[in-house]
Amino acid sequence: MKKAILSVSNKAGIVTFGQSLIEQNYELYSTGGTMRELANGGLPVKSISELTEFEEIMDGRVKTLHPSVHGGILADRDKPEHLEQLQAQGIDLIDMVVVNLYPFKETVANPNVTEEDAIENIDIGGPTMLRAAAKNFKHVITVVHPADYNEVIDKLKNGTLDEAYRKSLMIKVFEHTNEYDAAIVDYFKDNKESLRYGENPQQSAYFVRTSDAKHTLAGAKQLHGKQLSYNNIKDADAALSLVKQFEQPAAVAVKHMNPCGVGVAETIDEAYKHAFDADNQSIFGGIVALNRTVEKSLAEVLHGIFLEVVIAPKFTQEALEVLGKKKNIRLLEIDMTIDNSEQELVSVSGGYLVQDKDNVKLNREDMTVVTEVEPTEAQWDAMLLGWKVVASVKSNAVILSNAKQTVGIGAGQMNRVGSAQIAIERAIEINDDVAMVSDGFFPMDDTVELAANSGIKAIIQPGGSIKDQESIDMANKHGIAMVTTGVRHFKH
């Protein structure tokens, strides 16, 4: 007669499943509450102690951790020496393990849970049996989800419980134990900081730190101000990522995950002035990131407007004294070393997406002039600055820039010409030294025509549309210099 161990915290359907196993010539062994549930359902069930000849101890903490259990589960039936060793020790084979774990997640979800309660709901024997059975899936059936009970019985009845299906059950086990262990780590690790709320007051939120490296937002040193909010953290990360792209002194202002002004110059004070002038309305209540030390002169300028967060590699003591007069402003010191991590992930319903970071760096030599007119040096400088910025703007993104600052930003529109219209409407200036920068190719020539009608004389875009030539012809018609990069910068 085959042997099955049943030990579940979720007892839904377990009596019916146990009865079906008996009908398939299984002998049932169980523990604690599961054994009582099966017995109360009228099923013949034996205590796990009859296998181990060892009584449960320490309030049930030790009951299945025994060679008579794990030897019977782990024995490779294809190895005669394993079977001989079992026989010598008087250990029987275990053919099925049905386990789901102590409800740790549900326990710690209670805001009044104590650490002692959490610890008592860390399952030890259950995961150990599951992992042992899953490792030996070729010979042992492992069931971790009640939703699989009916299918397992059906396959036992019709003889189709093959190795491929056993492997699918094995995968579910390791997914289950992985999630279980992750929940324990999340609860006990001191890397979780509760936030006042999420994007909106009706949403709870917390910040989980996976790194304390000084060049990351998680490793930043907060020098002043109240706790960062969920939105502060997201905007600060966007600002930090962009400002690190510049070697020369640079200032980046961000609002709702989009840059609203970017400036570069010989000094950080002048760079901030360019970023502020790029959009002196949207910067109000925003995040500012700077890649040089903030001294008193710049601090006095920053003090003059409402900002949520200021990020810099260093603040002088005099600058801190000036900015410290504003009670709520958050001041973050962060190492400006570029983050070389290669991947990023985003959660979606039921999982997450992982992708390589958009770290492609292009120089002028990597780009191609596709029009009759060549860009001027000033236009090249404008395009190179804009190309760094556009990768941080939500798609569809079209921006206008000169050599020292963004002059108009069109973000997040469902069509490219719409983004271009916004950038032009919001532009603080348009002249021969201003370039239009697009994160994606032009599907038709209407955006180029709009640029021409607005007085723009230089465009940089990825290229790659089947109608590229129409856009090039339109540029040539109006004497516009156009450059293609061969690289797209969509951002969602």
UniProtKB/Swiss-Prot annotation:
Gene3D superfamilies: 3.40.140.20, Methylglyoxal synthase-like domain (3.40.50.1380). It comes from the Bacteria. Keywords: Hydrolase, Multifunctional enzyme, Purine biosynthesis, Transferase. PROSITE patterns: MGS (PS51855). One of its GO terms (molecular function) is phosphoribosylaminoimidazolecarboxamide formyltransferase activity. Pathway: Purine metabolism; IMP biosynthesis via de novo pathway; 5-formamido-1-(5-phospho-D-ribosyl)imidazole-4-carboxamide from 5-amino-1-(5-phospho-D-ribosyl)imidazole-4-carboxamide (10-formyl THF route): step 1/1; Purine metabolism; IMP biosynthesis via de novo pathway; IMP from 5-formamido-1-(5-phospho-D-ribosyl)imidazole-4-carboxamide: step 1/1. Its EC number is 2.1.2.3, 3.5.4.10. It catalyses: (6R)-10-formyltetrahydrofolate + 5-amino-1-(5-phospho-beta-D-ribosyl)imidazole-4-carboxamide = 5-formamido-1-(5-phospho-D-ribosyl)imidazole-4-carboxamide + (6S)-5,6,7,8-tetrahydrofolate; IMP + H2O = 5-formamido-1-(5-phospho-D-ribosyl)imidazole-4-carboxamide. GO terms for biological process: 'de novo' IMP biosynthetic process. One of its GO terms (cellular component) is cytosol. Residues 1-144 form the MGS-like domain. NCBIfam families: PRK00881.1, purH. The IMP cyclohydrolase activity resides in the N-terminal region. Belongs to the PurH family. This is Bifunctional purine biosynthesis protein PurH. It comes from Staphylococcus saprophyticus subsp. saprophyticus (strain ATCC 15305 / DSM 20229 / NCIMB 8711 / NCTC 7292 / S-41).
